Amino acid sequence: MNETKEMPIIFNSEMVRAILDGRKTQTRRIVKRQYISHKQELRLCDDGYFYWWMKDAETHQPRRVSCPFGKTGDRLWVRETFQGPFVDYNDSHDLFKNPESYQKPENCIYRADCGQYPSFYDADDNLRQGWRAAIHMPRWASRITLEITDIRVERLNEISEEDAIAEGCYTDDEYGFNAQPRLWPCQKCQGDQTYAAYANGVYYVDCRECDTAKKRFKLLWESIYGFNSFDNKRVWVIEFKIIEKR
């Protein structure tokens, strides 16, 4: 009987908001070992592992490849930028005596809920603390748990319009409410209908006639991984659903 495993996974604040809003049900992460040959591909076999195959071949290499985030049915606990635990002033003495009893998500503050403020501060501005990076979030502070519903491998540039939307990019209808007209011309049609968006790390796009969800995902990807990072590497495509949020 296969045991369900839990693994941590990091999301930035924009993607956390997309998950909580129900707009993000996929994530793509780079496969660490990349073969140069386009004749090779990673396939999922009956034993639940991926193997390198030559295209149209009947056998695979003996070394299996596992997705570092688990398999279908496993769980992911989300790491995000946060601060805490915080308690009322009257409980502060007990916090130092018995800190474990306050180590709960309900005693934490999350940057995804607070915009782009450089630090956390309370309502009276008496307490200011820098945010704690997502990489340092302990398990007890995580408020979101996901279940993996599917894993596959594909080239980054093969993403479809539907999958780009499932990555947390706005749909065309949603995007219209989050865009403002700009004056410079669209690079493709040379019109004056270029729009700017201020969500999910996207700062400029083509005009409505030229824009696609895939282009918005490309800009989102490069805002996270750097300029020219949308270079068609093989990626793990992890689909998930929320099973807990607190």
PLM feature spans:
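Secondary-structure transition motif
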Residues: M1-R246
